[in-house]
UniProtKB/Swiss-Prot annotation:
Family of the protein in this entry: Belongs to the glutamine synthetase family.
Pfam families cross-referenced by the UniProt entry: Gln-synt_C (PF00120), Gln-synt_N (PF03951)
Record's subunit section: Homooctamer.
Catalytic activity: L-glutamate + NH4(+) + ATP = L-glutamine + ADP + phosphate + H(+)
Organism (species): Arabidopsis thaliana
Keywords: Acetylation, ATP-binding, Cytoplasm, Ligase, Nucleotide-binding, Phosphoprotein
Record gene name: GLN1-3
E.C. number(s) listed in UniProt: 6.3.1.2
A Gene Ontology cellular-component term: chloroplast
Protein name according to UniProt: Glutamine synthetase cytosolic isozyme 1-3
Cellular compartment(s): Cytoplasm
C-alpha cells in the first residue's frame, strides 16, 4: 500500500510540464456529480483557454443512445487539492453539439440573469449554508447511530465536542482545508443539531461564482467521503421523526441593501419573495415538504413569514441588520439538495428584476 500511496501523491512538477485537468459537471438527476480527467500541455488559469470536451450523455441520463454526445464548456477553474501542483479542477456546464444548453444545465439561465445590467450593478452577494448528513455506506443510516436504532435526543450535538457528539469531524476538517486550498470562499463549518449532520458555509461570493463554488465544494465532499468509505446525503429529511432536516439557507444582499437605508430595500425585497412564494418553493429542492413542517427551526411550506432573528420563519433578518439599518437577509426555505444556480439567480430575478 505504501507504493500505491506514493504514486497517488506523486508530484509531477519536476518530471513534466504537463498537468491534469479534472472536468466536473452535473449529471442527469440534477444532483449527481460526474467528472473525468485529461492531460493538458501546461498550466492554465483562464477557463476560456481550456478546450471543450464531450461525454456520453446516454450514460448519465442526459441524451439518447443514438445521439449521445454532450459537450462540456469549461466555466471556472480551481486548484486540485488531491493532485496538487499545477493540476486543476474545472467546473463545466453542458450543451448539445449545436450549442444549446441541455435541460439539466441550470447555469446557463443563471448566467443570463446575473449578466443583466440591473442585476450586475447591484453586485448580489450570497452566503450558502450547506447542510449534509454522513451516512454509513451499507445501511443508509447516519454514522455513529446504532444500526436500526437511535442515539440520544437532540440537544448536545449542535457545535458539540467529543466522540459521542461530533461524529465525522475528520471528514469535515479535511473538506474544510481542501476547499481553502482549491480557492473556494468557504467561510466556516459546524456540527448540526442532528448527530452525523454537518454544515459548511460558502460566501459571501458574488453572482454566478456562488453556484460554481458550492458545486465544487460538494464535489470535494463527495471525493473525501469516497476515500473515507462514507456516503454523503443531501436529503432534506434523511431520518423521519423528531430530528432536524437538512437545508441550504441562502444569505443574500445587494449593494443598495448594504448601503445606508438598506433595511427598507430588504423589506421590499422580502415582499416580492412573498408574492412568489409558491414558485420559489417549487424550485428550492426535492422532498422539501418533508422538512418544511413548521417544526425543527423551519416555517410551514405553505405559509410565507419573515421576522427578525426568527429561525422559524421563511426569511430571517438578523439583529445586526435591524440595528444598523442595512445588511442582508436569510432565505431559510431552500433544501440541502437545491441547485445553487437556480436558487441564487431566482432570488436575484425576483428581488431586482421582479
Amino acid at each position: 500500500m505504501s507504493l500505491l500511496s506514493d504514486l497517488v501523491n506523486l508530484n509531477l512538477t519536476d518530471a513534466t510540464g504537463k498537468i491534469i485537468a479534472e472536468y466536473i459537471w452535473i449529471g442527469g438527476s440534477g444532483m449527481d456529480i460526474r467528472s473525468k480527467a485529461r492531460t493538458l500541455p501546461g498550466p492554465v488559469t483562464d477557463p476560456s483557454k481550456l478546450p471543450k470536451w464531450n461525454y456520453d450523455g446516454s450514460s448519465t441520463g442526459q441524451a439518447a443512445g443514438e445521439d449521445s454526445e454532450v459537450i462540456l464548456y469549461p466555466q471556472a477553474i480551481f486548484k486540485d487539492p488531491f493532485r496538487k501542483g499545477n493540476n486543476i479542477l474545472v467546473m463545466c456546464d453542458a450543451y448539445t453539439p449545436a450549442g444549446d444548453p441541455i435541460p439539466t444545465n441550470k447555469r446557463h439561465n443563471a448566467a443570463k440573469i446575473f449578466s443583466h445590467p440591473d442585476v450586475a450593478k447591484e453586485e448580489p452577494w450570497y452566503g450558502i449554508e450547506q447542510e449534509y448528513t454522513l451516512m454509513q455506506k451499507d445501511v443508509n443510516w447516519p454514522i455513529g447511530w446504532p444500526v436500526g436504532g437511535y442515539p440520544g435526543p437532540q440537544g448536545p450535538y449542535y457545535c458539540g465536542v467529543g466522540a459521542d457528539k461530533a461524529i465525522g469531524r475528520d471528514i469535515v476538517d479535511a473538506h474544510y482545508k481542501a476547499c481553502l486550498y482549491a480557492g473556494i470562499g468557504i467561510s466556516g463549518i459546524n456540527g448540526e443539531v442532528m448527530p452525523g449532520q454537518w454544515e459548511f458555509q460558502v460566501g459571501p461570493v458574488e453572482g454566478i461564482s456562488s453556484g460554481d463554488q458550492v458545486w465544487v465544494a460538494r464535489y470535494l465532499l463527495e471525493r473525501i467521503t469516497e476515500i473515507s468509505g462514507v456516503i454523503v446525503s443531501f436529503d432534506p429529511k434523511p431520518v423521519p421523526g423528531d430530528w432536524n432536516g437538512a437545508g441550504a439557507h441562502c444569505n443574500y444582499s445587494t449593494k443598495t441593501m448594504r448601503n445606508d437605508g438598506g433595511l427598507e430595500v430588504i423589506k421590499k425585497a422580502i415582499g416580492k419573495l412573498q408574492l412568489k412564494h409558491k414558485e420559489h418553493i417549487a424550485a428550492y429542492g426535492e422532498g422539501n415538504e418533508r422538512r418544511l413542517t413548521g417544526k425543527h427551526e423551519t416555517a410551514d411550506i405553505n405559509t410565507f413569514s419573515w421576522g427578525v432573528a426568527n429561525r422559524g420563519a421563511s426569511v430571517r433578518v438578523g439583529r445586526d441588520t435591524e440595528k444598523e439599518g442595512k445588511g442582508y437577509f436569510e432565505d431559510r426555505r431552500p433544501a440541502s439538495n437545491m441547485d445553487p444556480y437556480v436558487v441564487t439567480s431566482m432570488i436575484a430575478e425576483t428581488t431586482i428584476l421582479g
